[in-house]
Regions:
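Mid-chain, well-packed structural core segment of small domains
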Residues: 95-123
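Conserved short beta-strand elements that form part of the metal-binding/catalytic scaffold
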Residues: 9, 53-97, 138-160
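Broad gene-expression machinery/nucleic-acid interaction feature
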Residues: 31, 105, 142
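Core segments of cupin and vicinal oxygen chelate
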Residues: 23-29, 34-78, 116-118, 122-126, ...
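Extracellular structured ligand-interaction cores
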Residues: 29, 103, 152
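Short beta-strand/turn micro-motifs composed of small residues
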Residues: 36, 85, 110
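Vicinal oxygen chelate
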Residues: 2-25, 69-72, 108, 117-166
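Short Gly/Pro-enriched loop/turn and capping motifs at secondary-structure junctions
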Residues: 88-89, 113, 134
Length: 166
């Protein structure tokens, strides 16, 4: 039946790039992810330079092998900055740091992660990982996608967190 699913995936019943269809996915910029060697010095730099304050974290995420904190400017509706540091020696984020890449992903919230993944696949994106629950988002599901233009995006589902087993 694998062939059946493949044929269904290739069929696109509607063009998801039409404005009304995109609106139904509820895409909103959530944050910009920045790879850093250590959280504290980076957070302090953003505080001194631009007035950013830590609003959540740090969180250790054993699945992604990183530790993260979210920062925001007081009274500002702008997107947050997520600082991401390696938690282990084999953390994938270390590859970004080795290449001197800091800001490396934009994260968009979506009301329907499953429908959003169908949409991005139709646009030629590859799902790198997920959907899976994320510690930094109280168990809400995330997915990572790689665009044909060589950009990495994170999608995070809005709404209720996934209940973790006790």
């Amino acid at each position: 039946m694998i062939g059946e699913a493949t044929r269904e995936e290739k069929q696109s019943p509607e063009d998801t790039t039409q404005p009304g269809n995109l609106e139904s996915l509820g895409f909103r910029l959530s944050h910009v992810g920045v790879a850093v060697p250590k959280l504290a010095p980076a957070a302090e730099t953003l505080r001194k330079l631009f007035g950013y304050q830590t609003i959540s974290g740090p969180f250790d995420d054993p699945i992604q092998r990183v530790t993260v904190s979210f920062l925001k400017q007081a009274g500002d509706d702008a997107a947050e900055i997520e600082l991401i540091a390696p938690l282990t020696d084999d953390a994938p984020i270390k590859a970004m740091l080795a290449k001197d890449i800091g800001a490396y992903h934009f994260c968009f919230e979506t009301d329907d992660l499953d429908a959003a993944l169908v949409h991005v696949k139709q646009q030629g994106c590859v799902v790198v990982s997920g959907p899976s629950p994320a510690v930094a988002f109280s168990g809400r599901r995330i997915a990572w996608i790689y665009a044909p233009t060589r950009q990495l995006f994170e999608l995070v589902e809005t709404g209720q967190a996934v209940q973790q087993p006790a």
